[in-house]
């Protein structure tokens, strides 16, 4: 009987631990100040592969004459190594415009994407940063809306973790609930009063998204 009880207890402990691990994976600690405690496993992988995303996206965009022309017209925005230390995004009103480079992100990796699109650019929309300290809120307006948190990381990068809201949805989905809606990227300063949010391997449409950010 003792062997049976020990086996049952061991199985119960394993089940509890597995359930706790699953709960953590589904519900990240969004109150943490360190982004590593918040980011999902999938988003940490996206961030680690940021340069791979740049290389693939630029190659795909340059393969089309129209995409190559857009890249050549703004070398600072589309240079992966164009990063200026200091002067991170402060609270205030901004304007944002997103460029989608390459294929179809997660769909492309799964082999279910349609043929790659070289480069798509969106219209300028209003965006804003709110709050003080090591964590600040960032949100954009428009049909496809980003909403999430900026985490201080280094003197040249801020980490963004958030979600994508679509159409007439009243509120953004909680982070960590849907891989396709989750967003993870770096905010980098690339010029005088000019930044970009780089999103490697997003869930929809592209290999890399580059959001240009300037004061309103």
Where on the chain are the PLM-derived regions?
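Edge beta-strand at a domain terminus
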Residues: 72-76, 175-187, 192-216
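N-terminal signal peptide c-region/cleavage motif recognized by signal peptidases
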Residues: 18-20
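Short, solvent-exposed aromatic-acidic interface loops
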Residues: 140-147, 163-168, 199-206
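A short, polar/proline- and glycine-enriched secondary-structure boundary/capping micro-motif
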Residues: 146-153, 169-174, 206-212
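Mid-length scaffold segments of soluble, non-membrane domains
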Residues: 88-158
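Bacterial N-terminal signal peptides that target proteins for export
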Residues: 1-10
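Amphipathic/hydrophobic helical signal segments and adjacent flexible N-terminal regions
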Residues: 22-89
